[in-house]
């Protein structure tokens, strides 16, 4: 059944434009409270990133929960995976994240976790949508939900992150640059790595409500690359605004993306006897990852794009590790969703066990040339269903002769068509991608 409000990862949009408005978020809080109160008493955790609009939407959502009779626990600024973890440990019925992830400050969104710290099942999302279209009612005064704040939320999550590596772990002598994207990891990540012994230089850790992801973080790596070289660091780690994506930079300033990080963790887990089953990637995962894992006899399957689909595939197969090239990495032995800090720690442990630099360790995977072009579109029609787009995609696929892949898909979080072409010769791949993007752009116009 199609959804009216929910995308692939909650509800997201421009602040002040429907549905990211205070009145809608108030109604959403009420609908969530009503949905979960059907199971009895209800407590909901709310966390957010550092956007200035987060305070407005936190208050609105909290008011809606109270009107439904649900209690609220406020976490303040907290990485998305931290909210998932605390939802589990506090035995809450649900967790709420107010964030637009890697998007700029003038976007925001609401996404949810179940009491188990996983993304909401489809039937619960559909129930919330039905309630959103129903008249809002308020419980009697004596049954209004209560609100309290968890003051030690950051400390709890810091200790949880540290517990994901052996207690004997000591990164003494390791020089690391962290880019916190002026987002939700700005206090937590530096403390985690320093408490584990690393020498840490921190970038983009002064949020002002407007500078989240602004020329920093996992989608803007120039500053991190320069800082790693300037400080003669061993590596750099970049998080996105809500702390569920991670990218790295080696000591030469070369970018190490999610596919490569996933390979490093998988190889280490195999070598240490901790890998259960295989690895789940997505339709966007580089062919080089699949081939590198194949060389290690590690099974690999592709899920739809989105960490919720990666997680669903992991659960269905009872596997432990999956991720996306964007840096969402799920380590099921530790987490129930993509966790940037914990994924980075697993990579550092892999390097430590092998006695290698990041530049040396990444040589185990040879990525195939891949070009991704985003084309913005407006309107309700699906540009991917247009005959000229279908014909062009089929033509390029035929021209590549089985030596590459073509993938056209709509983003689940932004009004974009993603045009991806992958093959064994970069110039050819780029030419094909630009040709397809031009046709998609003409259709969208």
Swiss-Prot record:
Assigned protein family: Belongs to the phosphohexose mutase family.
Listed cofactors: Mg(2+)
Enzyme Commission number, as recorded: 5.4.2.10
Keywords (A to Z) from UniProt: Isomerase, Magnesium, Metal-binding, Phosphoprotein
Post-translational modification as stated in the protein's UniProt record: Activated by phosphorylation.
Alphabetical list of SUPFAM superfamilies matching this protein: Phosphoglucomutase, C-terminal domain, Phosphoglucomutase, first 3 domains
Function in brief: Catalyzes the conversion of glucosamine-6-phosphate to glucosamine-1-phosphate.
The record's free-text note on cofactor binding: Binds 1 Mg(2+) ion per subunit.
PROSITE patterns given in the database record: PGM_PMM
Protein name: Phosphoglucosamine mutase
One Pfam family named in its UniProt record: PGM_PMM_II
Residues modified as Phosphoserine: 101
CC annotations in GO: cytosol
InterPro entries linked: A-D-PHexomutase_a/b/a-I (IPR005844), A-D-PHexomutase_a/b/a-I/II/III (IPR016055), A-D-PHexomutase_a/b/a-II (IPR005845), A-D-PHexomutase_a/b/a-III (IPR005846), A-D-PHexomutase_C (IPR005843), A-D-PHexomutase_C_sf (IPR036900), A-D-PHexomutase_CS (IPR016066), Alpha-D-phosphohexomutase_SF (IPR005841)
Active site: 101 (phosphoserine intermediate)
Main enzyme class: isomerase
Positions contributing to Mg(2+) binding: 101, 240, 242, 244
Reaction equation(s) it catalyzes: alpha-D-glucosamine 1-phosphate = D-glucosamine 6-phosphate
Source species: Pseudomonas paraeruginosa (strain DSM 24068 / PA7) (Pseudomonas aeruginosa (strain PA7))
GO BP annotations, alphabetical order: carbohydrate metabolic process; peptidoglycan biosynthetic process; UDP-N-acetylglucosamine biosynthetic process
GO MF terms held by the record: magnesium ion binding; phosphoglucosamine mutase activity; phosphomannomutase activity
